[in-house]
C-alpha cells in the first residue's frame, strides 16, 4: 500500500532512474550494515550478489518497458530485482549469526543453506534476464560471471554434498513454479516479486518433502509442520484447479459443486493424512486442543472474532457507499483502505504479547482462508464468487493489475512472516535480546504503523515529494515518528522486551526501512517487514 500526493502517476514505461538509484542506495546500506555485522565469507557473497543484481536490474527494466520479457509482468513498477534478490540471502546470514551465537550448529547450517538458496535463485533470475536481452550486454555478463563465480566458489567449499543437493532441489522447483505460475497468473508479479514469492514457496515445498522423507519420532514442532503443509497444500490446490478449469466452465453450478467436493477430497485425503504423518496424531483433534488449551486462548479467539466481524462490516459499509454513489467506478479512499491495517495491528499486538504460538497457528489458518476465498473469487465459484468479486473490487489499487487480488494476502504475510521466521531453537525462552526483541513486531511497525501513518499524512498533508516518486517527505517523517512512539509503547506493555540500550540501531533500522518504502515500487506490505526483520535480527 502506498501514500501519494494528489498528482498524476507516470506511465508504466516512464523511466524512474532517480527513484531506482535511491532504492538501490537504501538496499546497499542494508547489505553493508549486515556485512559489517557478520563479516565473513558469506557476507562477502551477499555484497557480490547485490552488485550484480544492481546492474542486471536495469536489463529487466528495459525488457519490461519494451514488452520483451518471457512472461507478462506487472507494468506499474520497475523490476525490483535488487531488493528482492537480497531478502533470502540476508535473512539466512542473520539466522546463521544468531544460531552461531546461541551454540546451535544445526540451525547455523540451516541459515547457511537459506542464504545459499537465496543466492542461487537470484542468480538464476539474473541469468534469465541476460539470456533474453538483445543484443547481449557484454559488460553486465562479465559482472554477473565474476559475482557468480565468487559465490559458487565459496559455496562449493562451504556446503556439504547434501546441502548442495538441497539448494539445487529448491532451484529446480523454483524454475518449474516460475514456468507454471507466471503463465497461469499474468501481470500479478514483477520479476522481483516473483523471485521473492516463488522462491519462498519453493523453499517451503522442499523443506516439507525433506522432512516427510526423513521423519524421526518427536522431531519438530507441530505448528511448524502445520504451516508447511497448509502453504504447500493451498499452492498445489490452486495449480490443480487452474489446470482443471482450462477444460471446464468454472462459473456453472456443476463446476462449483465439483470444486467444493474436490476441496474436501484434497483436504481430507491428502492434506490431513500428510499432516498426520508429520505430527503423529489426529490433526483436527490436535488443532482443537491447541486452540482451546487455556482461558487466554479462548479470550483471544473471541476478541479476534469480533475484529473479523468489524472488518466485514467495513467492507459492507464501503460497498453500500459505492451502491449509493453515482459513479460505478467508485473506489475506497486511502484512509478507508488503511482501516484494515489498524484492525490487523489490533489483532497482532495482543497475540504477540500474550500467546505467540496461538498467533502463529491462527495466522496460518487465516492465510488458508484468504487463499481459499481468493480461489472462490477468481474461479467465480457459486454461491460466493460473484459477491466477492463485487466487494473486493472496491479496494483494488494499481498493484492488483492481474487476475488475482493479492493485496490483503500480502498484508497478512507481512504481519505474519516475522512471527513465522523467528529461529525459536536459537532463542532463550522464545525471545531475543536487545533490538532483536522487536523482531516479532517488525510487521506491526513497518506496515501496521509506519505505512498506515505515512499514507494518511502523506495523502492529506504531504507537499514535499521525494525526487522521482509520488511519496512525500512529510509522510516518511511521520512514519518514523509513529514507529518510535510504538516502540516506546511496546516497552511499556510488553515486559518481555528489553532493548538493552540498542536505541541507535533501532532508530537507524526504522529510518532505513521508511526510506525504502518511500522509493520502492514493489509490494511494500511484503518487502518492508522482511527488511526490518533482517535489520533488527542482525
UniProtKB/Swiss-Prot annotation:
Q: Please provide, alphabetically and separated by semicolons, the GO molecular function terms listed in this UniProt record.
A: dolichol kinase activity
Q: What is the effect of changing residue 474 to A?
A: No effect on dolichol kinase activity
Variant or mutagenesis effect after changing residue 471 to A: Reduces dolichol kinase activity. Significant reduction in binding affinity for CTP
The transmembrane segments are: 14-34, 75-95, 112-132, 135-155, 164-184, 189-209, 225-245, 255-275, 298-318, 338-354, 360-380, 402-422, 437-457, 473-493, 496-516
Which ranges sit in the Lumenal compartment? Answer: 1-13, 96-111, 156-163, 210-224, 276-297, 355-359, 423-436, 494-495
Q: Keyword Transmembrane: yes or no? A: yes
Where are the stretches annotated CTP-binding?
459-474
Catalytic activity as recorded in UniProt: a di-trans,poly-cis-dolichol + CTP = a di-trans,poly-cis-dolichyl phosphate + CDP + H(+)
Q: What is the effect of changing residue 470 to A?
A: Reduces dolichol kinase activity. Significant reduction in binding affinity for CTP
List where in the cell it is found: Endoplasmic reticulum membrane
| Top-level class of the enzyme under EC nomenclature | transferase
**Per UniProt, what does mutating residue 472 to A do?**
Reduces dolichol kinase activity. Significant reduction in binding affinity for CTP
E.C. number(s) listed in UniProt: 2.7.1.108
Key word Membrane present in the record? yes
Annotated membrane topology: Multi-pass membrane protein
- Pathway annotation from the record: Protein modification; protein glycosylation
Q: Which GO terms describe its cellular component?
A: endoplasmic reticulum membrane
What are the alphabetically sorted keywords of the record? Answer: Congenital disorder of glycosylation, Disease variant, Endoplasmic reticulum, Kinase, Lipid metabolism, Membrane, Transferase, Transmembrane, Transmembrane helix
The tissues in which it is expressed are:
Ubiquitous.
Q: Which residues lie on this side of the membrane: Cytoplasmic?
A: 35-74, 133-134, 185-188, 246-254, 319-337, 381-401, 458-472, 517-538
List, in alphabetical order, the GO biological process terms annotated in this UniProt record.
dolichol metabolic process; dolichol phosphate mannose biosynthetic process; dolichyl diphosphate biosynthetic process; dolichyl monophosphate biosynthetic process; protein mannosylation; protein N-linked glycosylation
Family named by the database record = Belongs to the polyprenol kinase family.
Q: What does this protein do?
A: Catalyzes CTP-mediated phosphorylation of dolichol, the terminal step in de novo dolichyl monophosphate (Dol-P) biosynthesis. Dol-P is a lipid carrier essential for the synthesis of N-linked and O-linked oligosaccharides and for GPI anchors.
Q: Which disease is it linked to?
A: Congenital disorder of glycosylation 1M: A form of congenital disorder of glycosylation, a multisystem disorder caused by a defect in glycoprotein biosynthesis and characterized by under-glycosylated serum glycoproteins. Congenital disorders of glycosylation result in a wide variety of clinical features, such as defects in the nervous system development, psychomotor retardation, dysmorphic features, hypotonia, coagulation disorders, and immunodeficiency.
Additional comments on file? Complements the defects in growth, dolichol kinase activity and protein N-glycosylation at the restrictive temperature in yeast sec59 mutant cells.
Q: What is this protein called?
A: Dolichol kinase
Per the UniProt record, the source organism is Homo sapiens (Human)
